[in-house]
A protein has these predicted regions:
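C-terminal hydrophobic helical "lid"/dimerization subdomain
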Residues: 286-344
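Mid-domain Rossmann-like dinucleotide-binding core that forms the NAD(H)/NADP(H) cofactor-binding site
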Residues: 131-212
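Cytochrome P450 core scaffold surrounding the K-helix E-X-X-R motif
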Residues: 42-49
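Glycine-rich cofactor phosphate-binding loops and adjacent beta1-alpha1 units
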Residues: 157, 206-287
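Glycine-rich beta-strand-centered segment in the early N-terminal region that forms part
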Residues: 22-39, 51-95, 101
């Protein structure tokens, strides 16, 4: 049995401690991945700073995004995954309160339906940027209590509807743009002007400056949706309150699915009759979307070049010891990139 090492979070408010961790063999529906690269997300420094989740016990291991090699396969895992496969995966340690399922260690147990085999021409570094952003975008777009859009495919039928992706250059946004297009929807997005080229390159038909004053942005959005049918709004980053105010006005001017879902904390003063929800990637394990995206769609989409890993990976160091440097940088804010740590 291999030895395992992890970046332990002893308690909130202190740095990681690099220590031994048990190597855990997989349950019947899981695989074990030897991690080559892990990526960092804002939730990582939030959970280092404070116990935001009452169900998460400390000491623990954090981290959600991994790319690596399958080294052990559970007895009921389908033939889709086998020993030696190069994969990306969404780690579930935070949601399950099981350190063996977290990313920030050498070996991670992952539910097989949240594992995607990656093509040989895709590096572990680039693959590692995808899992959490992809999962959050997928839940927001396709979950029945969210926008409830049709699932993506390699040859989508046009729906004649248009999604608004707010903050399209964010980790969730870049995935939402591509998933929306793959599901047959047109995508209008907001972003900083410096990221217009990025979001248009991913397929957005229009990019609008979210830093514009509210009146200007409302008029631009109204013009962008003139004659179009709204499929809903996925708000991926930024202040939800100001975005809700603009979208409430927009909903009065357009036709379609007037529903707003966000990844961030909702304000208390939401207008009456404003349909909304908050999305969490953790629901992907139980709603059928995980298998549809990670198992069925993503492997061929990556292989055929129909889905691009984004945002851009930026290596902050090598080894588990570099994770603390990464979360410290992430606290200061990053734009249109994903901080990653190579473990090999």
């Amino acid at each position: 049995m291999p030895s395992n090492t992890a970046a332990w979070q002893p308690k909130p408010g202190v740095p990681y401690e690099i220590k031994d961790a048990p190597y855990t063999s997989p349950p019947v529906d899981c695989v074990v991945i030897k991690n080559h690269t892990v990526a960092l997300n804002p939730i990582d420094f939030l959970l280092q700073d404070k116990a935001h989740f009452p169900t998460l016990s400390y000491p623990t291991i954090l981290g959600l995004d991994i790319a690596g090699e399958v080294v052990e396969v559970g007895s009921e895992v389908s033939s889709r995954l086998k020993l030696g496969d190069r994969v990306l995966a969404l780690a579930g340690g935070v949601s399950t309160n099981k350190p063996s399922r977290a990313a920030f260690q050498e070996y991670t147990v992952v539910v097989a339906k949240l594992v995607t085999k990656i093509p040989d021409n895709l590096s572990y570094n680039d693959a590692s940027v995808l899992p959490l952003g992809l999962a959050t975008a997928a839940c927001g777009l396709f979950q029945e209590d969210q926008l409830a859009l049709q699932y993506p495919s390699l040859s989508p039928n046009p729906t004649g509807q248009t999604i608004l992706v707010w903050s399209g250059a964010s980790s969730v946004g870049v995935n939402a743009i591509q998933l929306g297009l793959a599901a047959g929807y047109e995508v209008v997005t907001t972003a900083s002007p410096k990221n217009f080229e990025l979001v248009r390159g991913l397929g957005a038909s229009e990019a609008l400056d979210y830093n514009a004053d509210s009146a200007t942005l409302l008029e631009q959005l109204t013009n962008a949706f003139k004659g179009k049918t709204l499929a809903g709004v996925l708000h991926c980053a930024g202040d939800a309150g100001s975005s809700i105010s603009i979208c409430a006005e927009l909903f009065a001017r357009v036709e379609g699915n007037k529903f707003f879902t966000t990844t961030v904390l909702l304000p208390e003063d939401i207008p009456a009759n404003f349909k909304h929800n908050r999305v969490f990637a953790t629901t992907i394990t139980d709603n059928g979307i995980g298998e549809a995206i990670f198992a069925d769609f993503l492997t061929p989409a990556l292989s055929e070049g129909k889905f691009k890993p984004a945002p851009q990976a930026e290596v902050v160091g090598t080894g588990l010891e570099s994770l603390q440097k990464g979360v410290d940088i992430l606290r200061t804010g990053v734009s249109a990139k994903k901080l990653i740590v190579s473990l090999n």
